[in-house]
Amino acid sequence: MKKFTKLKGIAALFADINIDTDAIIPKQFLKTIEREGLGKNLFYDQRYEKDYEEKPEFILNIEPWKKAKIIIAGDNFGCGSSREHAPWALLDFGIECIISTSFADIFYNNSVKNGLLPITLKKDDINVLTDLAFKKEILTINLKEDLISVRDINISFNIDKIVKNRLINGYDDIELTLKNESLIEQYEKNKDKFFDWKYIE
């Protein structure tokens, strides 16, 4: 998994609340287990008329937000059904960070497991970033310092230490397991000491 330390890019604004996973990647695109190519189907119903004809008013069809790396979203982003394709599609499009006041738990966990950084901020900080996004300002996100910077504006954020370590080092589930392989082996060798086993013949 790609390591996440620092990100610099423009932010696209999705102000609606409760943007669900079906809006992010509709169900007809869930048949594949391939991650590449899903980006073109991101926000399909809002982004296209038919046959991938772009709706000119949609934010990701407008320069410079066509190249957005960050989304500033309304409350409860990623709600709805569980589908790992949602972070896959966002990442394949080029989105590497979502900033919101809140996330659906399953979407949050799926994002972290795939290297997509979800940042939770207070509403006042979201409002500041929203104004900057309208002005097409470049945001810098420094995960090591838990800091979002735009010119002379600095906004700090809190993130779970385990999540932070995982993203900075690019650990997926398998890599996390292998990292603790010696501890797992030690446990397996000594687990009989921890439990009062009764064997029945």
Regions found by a protein language model. Name each.
Residues 1-74, 78-81, 85-105, 109-110, ...:
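Cytosolic catalytic domains that perform sulfur/thiol-centered chemistry
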